[in-house]
Amino acid sequence: MKLNLLLPLLISAALGINPAECQTKPLVHAVVDLGHQFTFYADGRFHRQYLSDQKGVTSWGSLFNFDLSNANLLVLLGCDEHLSYVPQDLKTLSGFLAAGGGVLVLGSAGDKPQNALVGNFGCEFGGPAKKPFKPVNALVTGDIAGGGDILKLREPKAWEVLIADADDAPLLARRKIGRGTLLVGARGLAGSNPDASDDINAGWWQPVLTAAAAGKAIDARKPFKGRGLGELDHTVKAGRLTLRYSDYLQPYAKDMLAIYQRSLPFIEKRMGVPLSEGMASEIGLLATGGGGFSSGQAIGLAVFWGDFPKREDSMIEFLTHESVHSWVLPFAEIWNEPIATYVGNLVMADMGHQDEAMRRIKDTIERASRIDATLKLYDLNGISRSGAPKLEGGKANDMHWGKAFWVLEQLRAQDPEVMARYFRAKRQLAKPGALARYDANATVAVLIVAMKRDLFPWFREIGFDVDRTKSPIPVPN
């Protein structure tokens, strides 16, 4: 036996340690790309499902500006159809592969940017794969769940197929490029749920990804950090607002800033109070047409929401929705999502889109009316005080939204300025530190101040389990 192999065994024996415990665990430093396409799943969920015992970070900005020196795996789950992988990205990927890094690209036949990317390496996504799927490599063991599109390989001999469909067409394959490994597969072979509840194929994804990353040395002692919303490529100061965006989204930044600044006065008028100090003071642009978020100070806005910039009505509703989430803090609303969109519809109307705004309000209420024509049987959670069956799933969601819109419309019919009066009263009465909770009882108490009449009997009549004696906010006589 060679000395370099014998020495660890001798040391282990002398120290009384099992030699197997001396084997170094392969280390993976994974970077998941959010710059080309933002999804809540890509923001930490992929890592949680498939590399939970390894280090993982995200890149919210341009890929070519990310420091990959201490990374050995790059995960590209998708690219918004409005964007593409630019030449600087391809140069970065080629250099990373040449240095031994692993790159995972998932996609489908309909993903034009992903197809264009893998086309640079001799691959494209084809038609739907046929089940059952089968492993073609020892790394893949156990059941193969999910689905997706097959791969068309221009030089099959350059690739190693890991999974094939019933017709022996490749579904997951890898090839060596430089010292690195390119791994291409059907998007449906991995999870996608924002709550990370669908960790399909986790048993074999981990060894496959670890093997792909094995060609590049990393140092666990050195820093390995991601680039988040606060570290995008560009920062623009516009009054109290800080706008951040990546190189990819630079062509859309001017339009996004303009519509946000144009909408703010209308939002503030509807809310009745200015934003609290620091709230919604930072905006980051997201490469997506669906989904944003608010953390109070920071707001993430989907640049392509509602076919923006071709149309502005849905974008007005969306950015108002996210802004309202910051406006209502520190106490979220009992109808937190619906009221944010409802105010968004009112702002849409104020900004010249009256017909579309009222149509959306009407449609939302009608979805609840189809479940309960009286709109008096259920509360916001689909629970009935009168013995009607509890609502579940989609019906509960339709009731939550429709009932909230209906209540707010009933109040607005009595006082067109009710939203502004309500939020002014809430700002005065719901003080941080003085209030432990802001529930339905507190909500009705604040509405009483805004409307100047007792609303507890009416809310009980329409299905809310509220009691004036349980309100954490004093109820006016």
Give the predicted meaning of each segment.
Residues 27-116, 120, 152, 279-287, ...:
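Helical hinge/lid and interdomain linker segments adjacent to catalytic or ligand-binding clefts
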Residues 4-16:
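Bacterial N-terminal signal peptides
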Residues 22-30, 35-49, 69-70, 95, ...:
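Extracellular ligand-binding/catalytic regions of CAZymes and related secreted enzymes
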Residues 232-327, 331-332:
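Juxtacatalytic substrate-recognition/specificity segment
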Residues 302-370:
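Zinc-dependent metallopeptidase catalytic helix centered on the HExxH motif
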Residues 23-27, 43-44, 106-180, 221-225:
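An acidic, glycine-rich "communication" segment
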Residues 17-21:
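Sec/Tat signal peptide C-region and signal peptidase I cleavage site
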Residues 267, 339, 347, 369-467:
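Active-site-proximal alpha-helical
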